[in-house]
Amino acid sequence: ARLARALGLKVIGVRRSPLKPGDPVDELHPPQKLAELLPRADWLVIASPLTAETRGLINAGLLARLPQGARIINIGRGEIIDEAAMIEALRSGHLAGAYLDVFEKEPLPAESPLWDLPNVLISPHNSAAASGNDQRVYQLFVANLENWCRKQALTNEVRNTGIRSLFPRPELA
């Protein structure tokens, strides 16, 4: 939401909890308003957890409420969207496109029509699972542990004063 606003987009959010100072949205509505908000959405971004309330939430009826040419980004959970209904909306051109890194069945089966749709981008949900990443993480950890013991600067250090008190670090030499 913060990035979308930085790009000049109007951000309309839906969530159970009320607006808090600093929330990066122009409007925030309760989930009960979702259906009436969808006709205003050029992009529908789903970043919700999978719960009894969200499973199958975005069905054919709600997809039809999106404007012609809308796009979907789902980085939440695959089962939130009725995948068959989304595929139909993508094939018919009602949806201009979808960016997905989660699916009803994971990993996405090889026979899924999503692989062949030209208006769909697919990426892994957990890019940290890339080949060789575990080895790089272990090497970085060991190097940083050695640097920490020598009171030298760490690679990729995240400075968070809230967590610092839990893990006091000797001052740099």
Residues covered by each model-derived region:
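Rossmann-like dinucleotide/phosphate-binding beta-alpha-beta segment
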Residues: 1-67
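Short, conserved structural micro-motifs that define repeat-unit consensus positions
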Residues: 5, 10, 74-80
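Glycine-rich, N-terminal phosphate-binding loop of Rossmann-like dinucleotide-binding domains
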Residues: 41, 46-49, 75-76, 102, ...
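Hydrophobic "lid"/C-terminal helical patch
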Residues: 41, 90, 141, 145
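Short glycine-rich, flexible loops that bind phosphorylated cofactors or substrates
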Residues: 52-54, 80-81, 107, 129
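Glycine-centered, small-residue-biased loops immediately flanking beta-strands
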Residues: 70
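Rossmann-fold NAD(P)-binding glycine/threonine-rich loop
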Residues: 75-121
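C-terminal helix-to-coil terminal segments
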Residues: 106-173
